[in-house]
Each structure stands twice: as structure tokens, then as C-alpha cells.
Amino acid sequence: GSVYAERLVFDGEGDAVEAMNQTMQELQASVLSAARTDSMNLDTEMSIDTAESDGSEEETLPQEADAAQPVYSMALTIDGDDAITYLDDHYVCVRADGYEYTGGAHGTPFRQYFVFDRETGARLSLSDVVENPVEELQTKVGAAFRELAEKTNFAFESPEDLEHTVADGISYESPFYLSETGVVFYYAPYEIASYAEGFPEVTIPYSELEMRIELSK
């Protein structure tokens, strides 16, 4: 098996840059740790490669793999400019894409977003970004996914049932990211739709939200 994990490195100096780089380093370390644990559970050996965002090799730990062992691989990539979903003088949002394969027809993609305050280096949660009560967010996001389902019929459930499922699950801990036009809420494959649908998402425009932070765009 094998694991490959990239790490985005922010340029510059100061405590804020150091804090953001520390968060990204912790992400890389968590992926490597999870891969080691999974490979031990599968009783397979693996090679490990880690790289910074410029593609330079940072560490390589090759091991011999037995062809009879279970197939395992994990990758974490941060795709340069395409990984930046929002950027202004004060805030940045970064996407990290991952993929884990443990056998079968296909693996499991995963995705994380990191919203940073560039002045402090702090990673922001949804409650740091918006003031809306959870109940309002549940209504807005549920209705948006229902509208998407009515247009594309992408979900496991009917649009009406999907609206209730989404609304019941939305909280300040829900996965989200910042785009140029609004706050985006998303689900992983298989959560509300088939693997082929990827990461279903809806955008709630900034104009419809009570923002705690002032964005430049």
C-alpha cells in the first residue's frame, strides 16, 4: 500500500503565518497517522511520501510490499491556486482533497476546508463566520438542497424528505466553505446521494446571511 500527503505552506513571516502553517502541518500529520493505523488494521505494509505545496519531496519511507497483502492507498492533495476558494486581504479559504482506497470497486474521497483569519492565523468555524441562529441556517440550507433536488433529482430521498434530513442535520459544526458569492454547505459521497454525485453542495449568498466577518468581495 501507499500514502501520499501534501502540505500547503503559506509564505511570509509572523505569528499568523506560523499558526496557519501549523494547522496545515497538523492536517498532513493526521492523514499519515490515520493511514498507518488503517494499514496496520489491514495487515499491509506501505510506502509514505510527503510533499510541500511546491511539490518538493520532504520524506520518503519505502517498505517492501507483499503482493498477497490487501491493497491500500491514501492520498491528500492541495491543488495550488485551485485549492483557494476565497481570498481577500483578511481571510482565505483552502480546500484539501483526499482519497482512501481499501479495495473494491472504488475508494472513498474526502474533503476538508480551512477558513483562516489572515491577521491572527486562527481557523474559523461556522459560528465565527455567521450570526444567524442555527434554526435559520437549517431552514435556508434545507430549502436550498430541496430546490437542487427538484432540479436534478440527485438525492437518495425525495426533495421533500431531503429538505427535512438536511435541516435536521445542519449545525454550527456542519462542513462549509467560503466562495466568491456565499457560504457553501456540502456533503460527502454517500451521505445524501450516490458516489457518482460527488460532493453535493449549495451556496447561501452572503446577502442572505448575517455575517460576523467583513469580506471584501
Task: Give the label of every model feature segment.
Residues G1-K217:
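Compositionally biased intrinsically disordered regions enriched in Thr/Gly
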